Amino acid sequence: MKGRAVYIKTFGCQMNEHDSERMLGILGTKGFIEVDEPKKADIVIFNTCAIRHKAEQKFFSSLGRVKHLKKKNPQLKIIVAGCSAQLQGEKLLNKLPYIDYIIGPDNLHVIENIIENQVSHRIFTDENPEVANINLPVKRKDCVKAWVNIIYGCNNYCTYCVVPYTRGKERSRPVDDIIKEISLLAEQGYKEVTLLGQNVNSYKDGNTNFPLLLEKVEKIEGIKRIRFITSHPKDLSKELVDVMKDYKKICEHIHLPLQAGSNKILKLMNRKYTYEEYFEKICWLREAIPDIAITSDIIVGFPQEQHEDFEKTINALKEIRFDGIFAFKFSPRLGTAAAKLDGHISEEVKAARLIEVLKLQDEITERKNKRLEGKIQEVLVEGKDEEGFTTGKTRTNKVVKIYSDIKAGEIVNVKIAKTHRHSLEGDIIST
């Protein structure tokens, strides 16, 4: 290819965000620069999400807006990557022939061959058992905090989820590769790392499980904060809780998806735990780490969710009092077991239940944040927001707007002067 400009649009989770960083890293080694508009690009990449219908609709809408660019520039390459690409590869090409290439999550490395015109076909969706051993270059969006993949794929097969079909079976990265990557990040001045996986608790390389991996990362000089996402509740162990309590770099925050408060629904979801078992683990966490922030995911309107099942989810929110949640209406995904269940809930009922869940959680979050007024929080400064204010995050992952002008990467103590539903404000008291 002669042109060397790339535009990339990312949909979905942190794994996708990091996959986009890796694609940009590959292209960067070939002299590509990232541009902010598709019309300026020689390659347009859509890194897609298939977890919900809404994410797919956003992708198709964005894709439709670049179709005309092909007529103006026949050399333009349009690449669809990510989970929708994996699920619908051939179907997408047949339906939308102006797409040039389809790349699944296990095959990001083929972008190098594509730009060098060294490929003989257009669809790259084969499962790659070696994906955990391939260390790709990364062009990171941030200079303070970084994502680091530790495990790929998922073995849980929750009935509503396409991830095992789009990202394959679990494959853990070699521990030495992870430590080497994080050590390099520390040398480059990064202060925080987030360990990524569909289920980080399943990490296993030889004798190193996830708690032992955290211990190794803790020892890397220069890294000040460690986070991880996502944890499956069934695999949350007391060993992990003890490590979180004992090691000061591990932030006091965990994202632990509940999904529903009804045992009937949890069983239909194939979550492999009961609400009582989940709540016991919440108690472990809060007993060991009293100030821990716990966030979660909730799905409303799952097939066969009766009013009493939904009420159990409402009661769970009241009992647990999460710091925040991501809540969604159930979205049937083609090929999943849940899509084939009887008793699907109407869109009207799902919408009403979602509103009720979000309203309740907003009240809980607002009250919890209010308690932080006048308290001192350690904040890692991340940069400026759209209004020009200095912003950062607490160890509990709460966004803080800081009145003073401090450079990114500094860790400061902030006295919280004002709280909002989704953010805090305050003044620096020491650096």
UniProtKB/Swiss-Prot annotation:
- List the Pfam families hit by this protein, alphabetically: Radical_SAM (PF04055), TRAM (PF01938), UPF0004 (PF00919)
Using the record's annotation, list all stretches that form the TRAM domain: 370-430
Q: Which InterPro entries match?
A: Elp3/MiaA/NifB-like_rSAM (IPR006638), Methylthiotransferase (IPR005839), Methylthiotransferase_CS (IPR020612), Methylthiotransferase_N (IPR013848), Methylthiotransferase_N_sf (IPR038135), MiaB_methiolase (IPR006463), rSAM (IPR007197), rSAM_horseshoe (IPR023404)
Annotated [4Fe-4S] cluster 2 binding sites: 154, 158, 161
The Radical SAM core domain extends over 140-367
Single Gene Ontology MF annotation: 4 iron, 4 sulfur cluster binding
Which EC class is the enzyme in? transferase
**EC number annotated for this UniProt entry:** 2.8.4.3
- List the CDD domains: Radical_SAM
Q: Which SMART domains match?
A: Elp3 (SM00729)
- Where is this protein chiefly located? cytoplasm
Q: What assembly does the database describe for this protein?
A: Monomer.
The protein's job, in short, is: Catalyzes the methylthiolation of N6-(dimethylallyl)adenosine (i(6)A), leading to the formation of 2-methylthio-N6-(dimethylallyl)adenosine (ms(2)i(6)A) at position 37 in tRNAs that read codons beginning with uridine.
Please identify the protein, giving its name as recorded. Answer: tRNA-2-methylthio-N(6)-dimethylallyladenosine synthase
Q: Which organism is it from?
A: Thermodesulfovibrio yellowstonii (strain ATCC 51303 / DSM 11347 / YP87)
What is the phylogenetic placement of the source species in the record? Bacteria, Pseudomonadati, Nitrospirota, Thermodesulfovibrionia, Thermodesulfovibrionales
Q: Which gene encodes it?
A: miaB
